[in-house]
Structures are given as structure tokens and as C-alpha cells.
Amino acid sequence: MTIWVAAAIAFSIQAGGSRNLAEDPAVAKAVEAVRRIEAATIDEQVRLCEIPAPPFKERTRAEAYRQALEQLGLQDVRFDAVGNVIGVRPGASATPNVVLSAHLDTVFPEETDVRVKRTGARISGPGIGDNCRGLAVVLAVVRALNEAGVRTPGTLTIVATVGEEGLGDLRGVKHLFDRELQGRVDAFVSVDGAGHMITHGAVGSRRYRITFKGPGGHSFGAFGTPNPAHALGRAIARFADLKVPAEPRTTFNVGRIGGGTSVNAIPFEAWMEVDLRSVDPAALAALDAAFHKVLDAALADEHARWGRGGLELDRRNVGNRPAGRVPPSAPIVSAAVKASEAVGLPVGLDESSTDANYPISLGIPALTIEGGGRGEAAHALDEWFDPTDSWKGTARALLLAVVLAR
């Protein structure tokens, strides 16, 4: 018996698994299989990375993933109404139903060169870690369970989601819990990116496109007409002066601004896109309320400056990711910690915005784990992945899925 076989069995006992699971040599064989097939897992990671999956256009990569799930023998493999890919690995019982998931989309536009480069052990390419690593890990977990003949007491539902990034606003995972699998998920694990961290804090966000609109006019001839760009500037200045708590961490950002047609024309409109974040729902709500007061004040200031009205303020919500937190003492977090220890991964807990946000907000046991290895420059064209001992991330995901499905 190797050290990894012993670790798998010890983990099953420590995590509170049934005695039959703890004594099942197939679980240990599955961990060994993960290590043996890691080179193939990395090849799959590269293959998926070279299939573009820009925001709202994930279908080509999703089709490749659907085919992979069918080849692994999953049942009821399908697309749902929003484009998520779903397959079922039945257990001895329909419950507990554990979702093991990874997101399909990247932040990169359609024209991005997604060819992957290998330099020594390092692999680089846009999306190679976030989230082609997660997608490949989920497939490897299923493959290793199949090779070892593991039949979990509960069911594993495998999902590749759309819309995790940016203005996708978690549309895939929201549909999953609101429609496709509503009321039928007992635990949710998302695999996202490279590394070893366990994300148990859901950083919530509210995102807006704010537009000030007015009649416009010539910069000289119509001088004195309330100016949308000036109102926008007043709003940004007031917004930048807001005080937010350091704990719970709460942040804000003006990410994009625009408007106007010419240097010598009063704009018809000026706009900004804004991101508000906090891990605490109450802090996020307070920041949101303060932001809207800033907008009202900026509009009033611009009207008062010229002694007349004429501007309109359009507030469009373009993103709403709920905040929340799973306590470190929660069984699902404890199981993830023990799985990390069992395979020799460092234990680290953090907070982020991931697909797990939504089930956490619904009170469903959920978290996100990174997929092993090491990587940097996520969301950049020169993103890279170092596969040294990356199999440990897959092994952790496997152990966690098996124990949750007990």
C-alpha cells in the first residue's frame, strides 16, 4: 500500500465517511489513477484551452465537453436552456446529489489567439488556468472513479457552467439552482483555476451601467446647458470619497467611462460602469445605498450649478452576485481541508467571487477549490500554468466528491 492509498483511506475515516467507504480499496485505487493519468489530464486541459469560449459564446467548447462526458459513460448528458452541460454519474441512491462543476467561459474576446505554448514544464495561454484547469480536473475525477470502479453511495452530477465571468453574472449556476436542478442539490463543489486554495467566502457584487443624459449642444453656443460629462465627473469624485469598512472587506471601482461625440460639443450622454463588492451582504447593501445617494447628489449639483434642469439619470443593473460565507467549521469546509491534508496540499481558506456564490446564498453547502499546480496572470494573455504535482489538486477534488456523496 503506497502512502497515497493510505491517505485516501485515512481521509475517508477522518471526514466522517461510512465504514464501507473507508474500507473500500476502490477509493484508494482512484487516487492512484489520478496520479497515473495526470499527463493525459494536462493534455485535455490544453485541448480545451485551444477551443475559444468568449463571454456569451461558450457553445463550441461546451459541445466538446458534452462529447467528453458521453465518452466517460455519464447518463442523461445534455445542454440545459442556458447552455450548461450536464451529465449524471449515478450512485447507489439518488441522494445525496453532489454537483461537481467547472465554468466554461473565459474573459477573452472572440478574436483572441488561444494557442497554447509550452516552455519547459510551464504551459501558457489565455484561460489555461482559469478555467481550463478546472474543466480538465472534473473530467479526470470521473475518469479515475470509472477506472477504479468506485460506486458512490450518492449521485454525482457533473456540470460545466456558462456565464461565470464578468457580465455573465453567474447566469449558468443561477439557472442550475433556480430551474434545472431546483431543490435537488445537496452539495456543490466548483473547481476553478490553478493552485491549492479553498474558497468558502462568497464575495458579492453589484454592477451598474450609469448614464447621464441631456440635450447636448455646441460647447460655446450652448454653454450653460447642464452637461452629462460634468455630472458624471461629480458622481465619480463623490464616489471616490466614500468610506468603506476594511472588515468585512468592501470595495468599489469605476471600471469604464465613455460618452461624447466631439471636443467642442456638450455630450448627449456620458456613462460609467461600476463594480461594488463585499463578502458581507449587509455591507454590500449599505455601499449600494450610498452609491445611489452619490448619483442623486451629482445630478442635483449639476442642475444647481447652471440654475436649471435638463439631465436624466439612467441606472441599469448589469450584475448581481450574492454575498455570503460558509463557516470554516462547516462539514463541507472541514472535508475540503482534510482532503487537502490527505494528498499533501497546503491548506488555505479565502474569499472570492465564484460559481459557489449562488448556492452559498441559498444556504446549500457549497465551496470552490482550485485545481492544483501553480499559475499566475489569470485574465491576462500571458496566463501560465506549472503542472508540478498538479495531480494533487485532482486527487483532492476526487476525495471531496466521494465523501460528500456518501
Regions inferred by a protein language model and the residue ranges of each:
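Bacterial N-terminal signal peptides
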Residues: 2-12
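N-terminal hydrophobic or amphipathic helices/low-complexity stretches enriched
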Residues: 11-54, 202-204
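Metal-dependent amide/peptide-bond hydrolase catalytic core
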Residues: 13-29, 45, 76, 228-406
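A non-catalytic alpha/beta surface segment that caps or lines the substrate-entry region
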Residues: 43-95
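Acidic-glycine-rich active-site phosphate/pyrophosphate-binding loop
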Residues: 104-118, 185, 200-211, 367
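Glycine/charged-rich beta-loop-alpha catalytic/anionic-binding loops adjacent to active sites
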Residues: 114-125, 213-217, 378-381
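Acidic/histidine-rich catalytic neighborhood of metal-dependent amide-processing enzymes
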Residues: 122, 127-205, 244-245, 264, ...
